[in-house]
C-alpha cells in the first residue's frame, strides 16, 4: 500500500511518496490499474511473487478505509517520513504512527504489525507549517529516493523484511 492523497493536485507532493513508489513498481512490473474498494489496485509479479499495489482513493487520514479484507502481516506500507532526512529510505516492521495520520488510519484498521518502507522527506524549515510542507512539491533528494524505495519493497518481497532492513537501514 502506498500512502498519498488522490488527484493531480497532490501527485508530486512530499505526502504522496507512497503513491510515487507504487507508480515506480507498476512501471517496472506492469499490470493494469483497476478500481477496488476505496482504492486503485494493480496485481503485479515481482520475481514470481504475486503482489497487489494498492493506492487508497481516500485522503491520507482515511487510508485505512481501503484495507477491508487485508491483514497487517500481509502488508507493506510505503509512506513519507518527516523524521528521516530527505532522500533516505528505511525499512521497519511495526511501530506507532509517529504523528502520521495515514499510518494512524492504517493502524486503526489492521494493527501495527505491517512492514513499512519509509521515504525521508526531511523536516520543514524552522517555523514553517508542517501541513504546507508535506503538501508542497517534493524536492530533488526525496524524488531520487523513489526508485530506492521501490527497490526496498522488492527486497522485502524477495528476501523478507529482515534482509531488507539489513540492506536499506545500514548507515553509509
UniProtKB/Swiss-Prot annotation:
Q: Which residues bind tRNA?
A: 10, 59, 61, 101
List locations, semicolon-separated.
Cytoplasm
Residues marked Stabilizes the basic form of H active site to accept a proton (site): 80
Q: Name one GO molecular function term.
A: tRNA binding
According to UniProt, the name of this protein is: Peptidyl-tRNA hydrolase
The disulfide bonds in this chain are none
Gene name of this polypeptide: pth
Q: What is its main location?
A: cytoplasm
For this protein, the record's NCBIfam families field holds:
pth (TIGR00447)
Organism, by scientific name, is Rubrobacter xylanophilus (strain DSM 9941 / JCM 11954 / NBRC 16129 / PRD-1)
A Pfam family annotated for this UniProt entry: Pept_tRNA_hydro
> What InterPro entries does the annotation carry?
Pept_tRNA_hydro, Pept_tRNA_hydro_CS, Pept_tRNA_hydro_sf
Amino acid at each position: 500500500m502506498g500512502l498519498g492523497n488522490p488527484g493531480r493536485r497532490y501527485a508530486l507532493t512530499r505526502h504522496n511518496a507512497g503513491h510515487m513508489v507504487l507508480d515506480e513498481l507498476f512501471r517496472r512490473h506492469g499490470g493494469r490499474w483497476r478500481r477496488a474498494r476505496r482504492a486503485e489496485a494493480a496485481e503485479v509479479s515481482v520475481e514470481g511473487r504475486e503482489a497487489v499495489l494498492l493506492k487508497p482513493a481516500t485522503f491520507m487520514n482515511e487510508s485505512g478505509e481501503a484495507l477491508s479484507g487485508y491483514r497487517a502481516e500481509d502488508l507493506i506500507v510505503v509512506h513519507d517520513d518527516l523524521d528521516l532526512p530527505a532522500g533516505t529510505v528505511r525499512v521497519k516492521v511495526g511501530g506507532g504512527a509517529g504523528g502520521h495520520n495515514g499510518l494512524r488510519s492504517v493502524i486503526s484498521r489492521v494493527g501495527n504489525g505491517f512492514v513499512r518502507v519509509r521515504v525521508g522527506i526531511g523536516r520543514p524549515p524552522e517555523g514553517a507549517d508542517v501541513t504546507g510542507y508535506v503538501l508542497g512539491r517534493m524536492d530533488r533528494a526525496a524524488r531520487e529516493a523513489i526508485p530506492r524505495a521501490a527497490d526496498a519493497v522488492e527486497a522485502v518481497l524477495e528476501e523478507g523484511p529482515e534482509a531488507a532492513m539489513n540492506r536499506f537501514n545500514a548507515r553509509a
